[in-house]
Amino acid sequence: MTFPRALTVIDDNGMVINIIFWFLLIIILILLSIALLNIIKLCMVCCNLGRTVIIVPAQHAYDAYKNFMRIKAYNPDGALLA
């Protein structure tokens, strides 16, 4: 099957269409890579936010609890016998 000659502007055996499709493919790949990088940045921001909002305050509360519950060791010389 041959392409009608009346619709042929330049007889380049599909080179122009091939170049257009390659440029479209490259543009789509660039857009997908930009979207992937933005998703990775979003994950990093969420991890940092979770660390700042949840983990660090819980760690400070646990450290305060440990300091509050610290009991001095038994010293038999310092004990008072009644």
Swiss-Prot record:
Keyword entries, A-Z: Apoptosis, Host Golgi apparatus, Host membrane, Membrane, Transmembrane, Transmembrane helix
Primary residence: host cell
Task: Please give the residue ranges for the topological domain Virion surface.
Answer: 1-19
Coiled coil regions in record: none
Transmembrane domains' residue ranges: 20-40
Q: What function is annotated for this protein?
A: Plays a central role in virus morphogenesis and assembly. Acts as a viroporin and self-assembles in host membranes forming pentameric protein-lipid pores that allow ion transport. Also plays a role in the induction of apoptosis.
Q: How does it assemble?
A: Homopentamer. Interacts with membrane protein M in the budding compartment of the host cell, which is located between endoplasmic reticulum and the Golgi complex. Interacts with Nucleoprotein.
Q: What is this protein called?
A: Envelope small membrane protein
What phylogenetic lineage does the species belong to?
A: Viruses, Riboviria, Orthornavirae, Pisuviricota, Pisoniviricetes
Q: Which gene encodes it?
A: E
